[in-house]
Amino acid sequence: MIVSRRLLLGAAVVLAGSGSYLLGRSTPKEDTIADPDAYAAKLGRQQGLTIGFGDPSTFYAPPYLPVDAPVEGVVLSPADRTAVKDSLHGISKAFEAYPEQCLGRIIKAIFIAGKILIDGAEAGGTYGLDWIFLAAPSNVSAETRRLTAELGVHHETSSFIWLRNDALQRAFTALEPAGWQFQNSATDQIARNGQTAPPVETGFLSAYGATTSENDFNTYAEIVFSDPGRLIKLAESVPLIAKKLALTLDSYIAVDARLHETFARNGLLKAAGR
């Protein structure tokens, strides 16, 4: 099992250290989802994938089978339907960053659980064989559920980009600081997240991103799609960040060439020297 494959629960810890992102967000619109099942189906058609919730034993997508639903070391609980609505709002917001049918080229499904435990540590998201899981616990605020889902789509989906691209892994890892101490366990990664972020000159965008190379890439992808302006400013002042940004953009464009226009329009390509 790869313990680095998780989104930490709670908005503050998945924002890659950008407190201003929270402050600048608009107030979510009043809940208008009357039928979560119908709304999930509509969203799924938009990106060419399945969005499901309910019994975690059903969390798989064809051609996979029920036996493929469980993930070693991961415990999922069913989500409350009211909480699911908040997550669907977040997923909808995340989908705005991608061309239609784009995410369906990367994953087959998104499943909304209640709590997600990885080796006993509570997480905001993780992934299975060809799908991702997002947490919608009832004991956090509606806005936390929305934001965890929004950023979780970017964060968890990016792991499939990472794991399927050996050249990307080699190039990205080669840019990490020599001798950097990464964290192998879920509990150690959570503990590192609570610490001060490394200097931006290291190329890491947050304390959590500095825990593993995969988490580092996840954090770049998360900010590319949720707060590109922040990455543009950093890339313009830190050459190492520009290099890692370029690798991130290239890896996504290789999956969907339409993203070249997206990244050109929002200024990321220019900031990355592409």
What do the PLM-derived regions correspond to, one by one?
Residues L15-G24:
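Hydrophobic alpha-helical membrane-insertion segments, chiefly the h-region
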Residues L23-A83, I112, T187-P198, A210, ...:
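Non-catalytic architectural context of zinc metalloproteases
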Residues I107-R274:
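Active-site-flanking segments in enzyme catalytic domains
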Residues M1-S4:
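Short, Lys/Arg-rich N-terminal segment immediately upstream of the first membrane anchor
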Residues L8-L9:
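N-terminal export leaders
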Residues V71-L129:
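Auxiliary, metal-adjacent structural segments of Zn-dependent hydrolase domains
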